[in-house]
């Protein structure tokens, strides 16, 4: 499985301090396992197929994709719980 980050997610990670960034990256690695590990829930509404991963007070918004030969984990956004859903 390949992991791809959106520009928004990369910027969010760059703004975080190193311990938090490492904690979130470790949680994202858990999503590549079968079955995925973590506090995961599907997001309601559109577009469908998006999920959220809870990492302390932060949320990781992601979806799975497929390029024909490999499953891709797209990290869409990362942010504090209060701001990420806006």
Briefly describe each language-model feature range.
Residues 2-3, 7-8, 19-22, 55-58, ...:
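Enriched for short, Lys/Arg-rich terminal
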Residues 8-10, 46:
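Short strand-loop junctions, especially beta-strand C-caps/beta-turns
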Residues 11, 38, 82:
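Glycine-centered loop/turn positions within well-structured domains
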Residues 15:
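Small, basic N-terminal interaction modules of short regulatory proteins
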Residues 29-52:
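A short, surface-exposed loop/turn module that caps and links secondary-structure elements
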């Amino acid at each position: 499985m390949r992991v791809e980050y959106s520009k928004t997610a990369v910027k969010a990670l760059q703004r975080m301090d190193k311990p938090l960034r490492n904690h979130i990256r470790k949680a994202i690695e858990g999503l590549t396992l079968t079955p995925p590990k973590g506090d995961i829930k599907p997001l309601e509404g559109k577009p469908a197929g998006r999920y959220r991963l809870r990492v302390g007070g932060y949320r990781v918004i992601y979806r799975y994709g497929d390029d024909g030969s490999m499953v891709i984990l797209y990290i869409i956004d990362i942010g504090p719980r209060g701001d990420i859903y806006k």
